[in-house]
Design a protein with these regions (language model features):
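Small-residue-biased structural context
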Residues: 1-197
């Protein structure tokens, strides 16, 4: 694990909570008078953020909880909840250009996400904080950050463009800067390890 990534990374629960906040803030940008180009960018951002978030949880966070003996109905339901979110994302994408139908699908997606967020933040994350301890949660956060950078890197330009379209100018510049910095960091890490990323 790269020590720079480790130092810069939030703990796993903090990262998950930040992801939840980001996605919910994107949902709140979708107003009836949102211009179509901005709306499309926000919808793409929501879908990408949810897909990346779910993949990181499934690959790193949930297995670590299970290995540590955490048992929770919410943890057992997390996989099916992610599957439901993925199906709704596909529906949202398939309805592109059909505003009313897509709005209805987005509403269903938002409800599914809110239910999952509530379960995660009231049951799964508190259990992780009780059972895993600060050092393990920091390690998981660093691994999740590294994986996020790997997943974002091939789509960085697309994600940055959507963030820029869907955000105020100051926020967009900060987001683009963060994505560029993340890409440079991953390239540097890859060179040090002798990999081409």
């Amino acid at each position: 694990m790269n020590p720079i990534v480790r130092k810069m990374s939030p703990t796993a629960p903090s990262m998950i909570r930040m992801d939840h906040t980001l996605v919910m803030s994107h949902f709140h940008k979708l107003e009836p008078d949102t211009p179509e180009g901005v709306r499309a960018a926000v919808v793409r951002s929501i879908c990408a953020a949810l897909e990346i978030h779910a993949q990181i949880e499934e690959e790193i966070f949930y297995p670590a909880l299970r290995e540590s003996g955490v048992e929770s109905p919410a943890l057992q339901e997390a996989g099916p909840a992610h599957d439901e979110v993925r199906k709704l994302i596909e529906r949202v994408r398939a309805l592109n250009g059909q505003r009313t139908a897509q709005d209805n699908a987005l509403h269903e997606l938002m409800n599914a996400v809110m239910h999952h967020v509530a379960d995660e933040e009231t049951q799964i994350l508190p259990a992780a904080e009780r059972f895993l301890g600060p050092e393990r949660l920091s390690d998981l956060g660093a691994r999740m950050t590294e994986r996020r950078l790997e997943l974002v890197r091939p789509r960085a330009a697309e994600l940055a463009a959507d963030m820029a379209r869907g955000a105020p100018a100051k926020t967009a510049l900060m987001a683009v800067g963060a994505l560029v910095a993340g890409g440079l960091l991953m390239s540097r890490i890859g060179r040090r390890r002798g990999m081409h990323l």
